[in-house]
Structures are given as C-alpha cells and as structure tokens.
Regions:
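Well-ordered alpha-helical scaffold segments within catalytic/enzyme domains
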Residues: 333-341
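Conserved small/polar residues in nucleotide/adenosyl-binding loops
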Residues: 347-354
Length: 358
C-alpha cells in the first residue's frame, strides 16, 4: 500500500517481532530510539509510500532513563551528596543519552537502506500535547531534534549539509505560538531551523481541531491526511491506519488538449475522473484478500494491526479504517492555459472563476 501512521506507541509499549525475534519494551531512551529506527526500516521495506511517527511516544523512555540514573546515583552515593548534586549528575547523564538517542534516529534513517533501495521516507511529528504526562521530556526531545537538524549531517567531504530525512512537522498550539506561552522557545528554535534547513513544516493545532473533529495528528509521510475514524469503543484512532493508494490527475494536460474550450475541458475532466476512479478501485481490489503473512511487521506485529497469522486484511480496507486518494496537479498552469491570464490576477474575472471552479 501507499503510506501510513505507524502505531509506534503500541509497538514500543507492547513489543514487536522482527526477523522472527521478539523485541520487548525498551528500558531506556537510547534503546527506544534504536528500536524505533529498526521498525521504520522494516515498515518502509514493505510499502511504497511514506510513514510518520509521533515523537511523543519517546517521552516515557526518557523518563525511564532519568529514573534509572537517579536510582544508580542514590545507591552509589547514598546521603553523601546533596539533592542538587545528585540531580546535576543525573541530568548530565540524561543529556548525553538524549543527544546520542536523537543522533541515532538521524543517522540511522539517513544511512539505512530499505529493500526498495532507498532511505525510508519518514516524517517525525513534533507535537506537545498539554495533557501529556511526559510533556517536559518531549519538549527536551523536540529541542534536541531541532538543534541537531540545524547542525546538519556531514557529507563525504566533511561539510555539514541538510539531511533529506526525516522530514519534520512542528505543531503550533496555544502554548508555543509566540504569545507568551511556556514553549515559545521551541517555536523560535523551529523558525531558526526552517530558515537554515527548510524544515520543519508547520501545522496549526487550532485549524486541525476545526477540520478533524477536535483531533491533531500527522500527515502520512509527506502530505496525505487520514479522515476521522472511531473504533468499537467510540475512541478516535489515527495511528495504525493507512492509505491504500493514490492516483493523481494531470490538469494541465487536459487544458492543453482543450485549447481554451471550457466545454471540452469539463467533458475531458469527467472522462479522466472516471478513469482515475477505475484505477483506484483496481488498487483497492488488488489489496482485498491479502493475508497478514505478506508483511508481518504491518499486519501481525503492530505497525498497522495485530492480526493472526494468514488472516485476511480485508476488514482494514473497508468502513473508513483506511483511505484511498485522488490527487491533482497544475491548477495555476491550467488556469493560465484556459484563460491566458495568471490566476493570481484577481481583477480578471474569468481567471478567478476558472480557478475557483477547479
């Protein structure tokens, strides 16, 4: 299939299986980062589209590392050091692990090759949920991700360059929209990062909630968004869902054939849309009957679902669980070809109407 939101929280919490080996829940942040990149590589090798992971699921493992270091130093030094000194020791170790873990994510994604012969097309979703019990840990993780992206990765000549992946999406909300919120410093860092490295892209949590029934979630890979869907308990679910496939329609090509004849353009468009529908249904029907054993990491071990061995995936193809997409390109070019005027010219009525109709 095309793209997905990996259910990384479930896979880290409840374990997964890769190459016939059980991967249990990590006991530290560094291990969680390593396991996450292994999951990304395995998932990317069995689908042709991109995938996204929500960084907030790593927060609990950073706290596990903090608690582990605190217990270690308390046992080692007992009452011979003050709480301030103890916390300084713990934070020094924690920051080292935080940097190493984030570096693992960045370098693994940019050096691992999937069976498709390319780096995984993966997006990291950087969102701070005010109700998240690990929000402080996640703020630390996001800050480190941005700092390392600003620095870049050295190429073969030792020059720092902008890595192609992972793509970053940063969520703007009330607490970080540069209006005096607690996490405004992260947004300023994100803007600095975008100015130098082109990423992150930005999503408005306010607009997401307006458009998606109060939910905030990542696109799948680069641009395709899921529609809201509720499970049998009435709970919204986004992670662990996917897009079956996409077909894009070339609008300028139709405009070239129409040669300015609007009636001919709309007739051709209807014909092409019918063809697109047939292509999308061909993709859908090709997936029907697929058994979970075709890609265990997706269907059996948590990336999408936890189906039984050789269980058909059909129930995940219907009733809104997954999506199928029709895309388009060239609205600007089409309007220019049909009217002879740039569509950004609001004073030209026909250009404006053509663009609006499209």
């Amino acid at each position: 299939f095309n793209c997905c939101l990996i259910n990384i929280g479930d896979m880290l919490e409840n374990g997964t299986v890769m190459n016939g080996k059980l991967i249990e829940t990590p006991k530290s942040f560094q291990v969680a980062c390593t396991v996450m990149t292994q999951i990304i590589s395995a998932v990317a090798s069995s689908q042709y589209g991109g995938q996204s992971v929500d960084i907030r699921h790593l927060g609990k493992y950073l706290r596990k590392s903090h608690d582990k270091y605190e217990a270690h130093y308390r046992q080692k030094y007992g009452d011979t050091i003050t709480e301030d000194v103890l916390e300084e020791f713990v934070n020094d170790r924690l920051m080292d692990e935080l940097k190493s873990g984030v570096q693992t994510i960045q370098y693994q994604i940019n050096t691992l090759m999937t069976t498709n012969g390319q780096s995984p097309f993966v997006t990291l979703f950087l969102n701070l949920d005010k109700d998240d019990p690990y929000i402080e840990e996640n703020a630390m993780i996001i800050e480190e991700i941005l700092n390392q992206r600003i620095e870049g990765i050295k190429n073969e000549k030792g020059v720092y360059v902008t890595p192609a992946f992972p793509k970053l999406i940063y969520v703007l909300d009330e607490h970080n929209c540069l209006k005096g919120g607690k996490y405004d410093y992260l947004t300023r860092l994100a803007v600095k990062c975008s100015a130098k490295r082109m990423y992150p892209d930005y999503i408005s949590a306010k607009k997401m909630r307006e458009n998606y029934e109060g939910n905030v979630f990542s696109c799948m890979g680069c641009r395709s968004f899921l529609t809201p869907w509720k499970d049998e308990n009435g709970e919204y679910k986004f992670e662990g869902r996917f897009n079956q496939g996409v077909v894009s329609i070339n609008l300028p090509q139709i405009a070239i054939i129409a040669q300015g004849d609007e009636e001919k353009f709309w007739t051709l468009l209807e014909e092409r849309l019918a063809l697109c529908f047939d292509a999308l249904m061909a993709r859908h029907h090709a997936l029907e009957g697929t058994l979970s054993s075709v890609s265990p990491i997706h269907w059996q071990y948590g990336a999408i679902a936890r189906l039984g061995k050789d269980e058909p995936i059909d129930k995940l193809l219907h009733d809104g669980y997954s999506t199928i997409s029709l895309g388009y390109i060239g609205v600007y070019e089409t309007t220019k070809l049909m009217t002879g005027v740039s569509p950004v010219s609001y004073t030209h009525l026909r250009a404006h109407e053509t663009r609006s109709n499209l």
